[in-house]
Amino acid sequence: MPFQYHVREMTAETSAEEFVTRFVRVEKFLPFCQQCGSYNTRWTCPPFDFDPMTIWRSYTGLRLYARILQADVPEQPLDVAVAALKQEKRLYRELLQRWERETPESQMLLAGTCDQCETCEKVQGHPCGRPELLRYSIEALGGDVEGCLQHYFHMPMLWGRDGKAPDYFVLVGGLLTK
């Protein structure tokens, strides 16, 4: 049976400077990235050959976007929910891409690692095969997604456990603006 849910969307506006002051701690979050299977295997994930702060400092505004998958039935199977989350991530990316196209000199920030290619070229030591699609996530650039979710959207991050999906999943990203 498919994951039974509905989608809620929320946005919040802040300055890039305020967001950095409150939520960006590159050195704090890098160890979490190092525990992930995408670390050093995707061009969108650390380690980088640049300082992530250069991206944050290149912009003045940030429109945060939360796409919430609210379960309609409690304790649904986690694997089914994760499959739905992957589908929603595609729709989420499409919206952020539209915002980026419509906003000159902006850069979208995605949720989680890039999934545009089945196998990232970084693994083979090659440049990104789709550089026009390469975008970083808030967390890859040292941002505290849980803290930002609580502060701007007044909701905690929930995690599945014991094979059961949480009451909701949230994809958090945004659009950096000049």
Identify the residue ranges that each predicted region occupies.
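Catalytic cores of enzyme domains
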Residues: F3-K178
